[in-house]
Each structure stands twice: as C-alpha cells, then as structure tokens.
C-alpha cells in the first residue's frame, strides 16, 4: 500500500459533485489555490501584495476585484521589520481605508534568517496550523528558491512545497517573482517569469505586470488634472463661494484654476500652495503605468487591466487614458 488516493469513477461523482472552493479573489483565484505575480523590480509587486493583504483582511476590492474577508499571513523575506511595518501603514493610508481589521493581518519577518522553502514550509505549517488563514503571501520567492531556477525537476520540487502549504493549511498561497531579462512586450505572460517554465505553469493563476511607455501628452494631462484637483481642494477650504460660482471649464485647466486661487486665496496661503504645486509636479513625474495580464486555470481570461502605480499604491485606470499605450 501507499499513501496516494485511489482512482475515482466519474459515474459515481456525476450526480454528487463536490463543492468548488469559494473565490478568494473574485473571477481570479479560489481559496486553497496558488497564484504567482510576475513583473520587473520597479512594478511595485511588494506594494501590490500588501494592497492584497489589506483587501483580504478588510474584505475590500483589490485592483477592482472583490476579495473574500479573512485572516492573512504576510511572509516578509526582503524588508527589515521597521520598513515592512511602515510600508503596511503607508499603504493603508494611501488606500484611504479605515484600519478596522488589523488583527486579521499577521507578518512573519524573516529577513536575514530565512531558509530554503523545503525546510521553511514545515515550520510555516506548524506555526500557522491553528490560525485559520485564508491566504499566505510570500514576498519574494527568490529568497527561498531551492536549486537551480532553470531546472524543471528542481523547480517542480520547489513548487510542491506551496502545494503542501495549501493542502495542510487549507489556504491560498500567493507569491511574486521577477521577470526574465530582456524586452517583455512581445512575450506571452507565462513566458515572462524568470526561470523554468514550471514556474509559470504551476500556479492556478498567473498575473503579469508589464510597463507601459507614457507619452509626454499623457504626462502633461496627468499633471494638469492633479493641479486642478489641488486647486479645487484649496478653494473648497478657503473660498467655497468662489468654487460654487466657478465655471466647470475653469476647473479643468490648471492655468485658469491657479488664477482663481491667486485671486481668491489669502496671499500667505497662495504662496504656500505654490510650493505644494512643485511637489505635485514631481509626484506625477514619478508615476509609472502598467498593464496587468493574466493566465487563469479556474476562470475565463480577463481583459488586461491598465494601472497607475502612484506610490505607494496601484490605481486602476477607469477612464481609459492608458488603453492605447504599448508595453515596453
């Protein structure tokens, strides 16, 4: 005898189908399954995983997809403890969510003491057994890879460790990995993740981030919008009657909106606001744009999503500014 399951008759199962696992991320990933997020280092993958941790803990949306609410373990292999904790708080604040379910997020800080995944998995399982997590997030996996990442059999053994965590804890495992070297735009999503093809074919969902090349026109448009929004906020605070009477067109041009501020804000407030405008311009310059594509085992393929990475969070482009841009 062995410890493998017996063969099943389809005839016996036909009228008595087992329940499918409920979704963890609507139309993307089921509870108890595995997901890989791949992308270059500047894509903000760690921030995306922290956003996901928060969305699961609070039962909110992540990048436009509804998440099931539950407990989550974030395994931090890269950041020092203080940086990781600050990053969580920064992302919470940028997502503008009340921190109502902090008790649902646990962090395992392993920087400097990490081990290969085949030794780490049993320790993780033992510690997490009674915690009732619905997701374990491992960031990043290059820190725990055992063997040569270009070797199919060694990577199959490595990926099996994630299966053990899923099976024994009954939770999803989500992890991120870097892109292979070279231009990514012409490759399929499952060929972009670095290392053996096992990486891309093993998870139940593969999400892939590629950078979009921003035109100067779009940068100017974003700067204009950001300055107009800031002007509206200043007028709302200091000259609400002027804001109520202003024509909508005047509030869509940063030149006209700034003129309204200059004419109606107290001089000291306006001077301070001008230095704030310089910060806004710098912040907009630092924004990057991304296309999120996916290969899913359990759900139909979704239309690629276009995202802004507005440090420290990703924001879905809901108005279509990025839809015609090419990936780099």
Feature names for model-found ranges:
Residues 1-2:
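Short, small/acidic-rich helices and loops at N termini and domain boundaries
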Residues 36-37, 42, 47, 135, ...:
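Phosphate-binding/switch region of NTP-binding enzymes
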Residues 310-328:
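DNA transaction DNA-binding modules
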Residues 12-13, 19, 25, 67-153, ...:
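Conserved inter-motif catalytic segment of the P-loop NTP-binding fold
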Residues 48-52:
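Hydrophobic positions on the alpha1 helix immediately C-terminal to the Walker A/P-loop
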Residues 18-29, 61-62:
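Pre-Walker A adenine-sensing motif
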Residues 31-35, 70-71:
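Pre-Walker A (Motif I) flank of P-loop NTPase domains
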């Amino acid at each position: 005898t062995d410890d493998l399951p017996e063969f099943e008759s389809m005839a016996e199962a036909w009228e008595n189908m087992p329940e499918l696992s409920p979704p963890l991320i609507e139309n993307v990933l089921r509870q108890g399954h595995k997901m890989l997020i791949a992308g270059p280092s500047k894509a903000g993958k760690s921030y995306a995983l922290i956003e996901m941790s928060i969305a699961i803990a609070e039962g909110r949306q992540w990048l436009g997809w509804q998440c099931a609410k539950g407990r989550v373990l974030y395994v931090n292999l890269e950041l020092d403890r203080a940086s990781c904790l600050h990053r969580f708080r920064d992302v919470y604040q940028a997502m503008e969510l009340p921190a109502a379910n902090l008790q649902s997020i646990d962090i395992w800080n392993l920087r400097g003491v990490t081990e290969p995944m085949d030794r780490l998995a049993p320790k993780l399982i033992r510690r997490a057994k009674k915690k009732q997590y619905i997701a374990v997030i491992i960031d990043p996996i290059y820190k725990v890879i055992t063997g040569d990442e270009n070797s199919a059999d060694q990577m199959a053994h490595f990926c099996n460790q994630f299966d053990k965590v899923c099976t024994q804890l009954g939770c999803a495992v989500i992890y991120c990995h870097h892109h292979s070297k070279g231009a990514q735009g012409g490759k399929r999503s499952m060929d972009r993740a670095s290392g053996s093809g096992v990486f891309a074919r093993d998870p139940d969902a593969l999400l892939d981030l590629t950078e979009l090349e921003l035109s100067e026109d779009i940068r100017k448009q974003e700067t204009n919008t950001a300055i107009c929004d800031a002007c509206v906020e200043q007028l709302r605070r200091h000259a609400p009657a002027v804001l109520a009477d202003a024509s909508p067109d005047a509030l869509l041009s940063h030149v006209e909106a700034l003129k309204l501020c200059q004419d109606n804000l107290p001089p000291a407030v306006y001077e301070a606001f001008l230095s704030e405008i310089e910060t806004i311009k710098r912040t907009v310059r630092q924004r990057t744009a991304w296309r999120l594509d996916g290969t899913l085992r359990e759900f139909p393929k979704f239309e690629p999503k276009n995202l802004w990475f507005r440090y420290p969070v990703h924001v879905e482009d809901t108005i279509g500014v990025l839809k015609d841009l090419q990936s780099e």
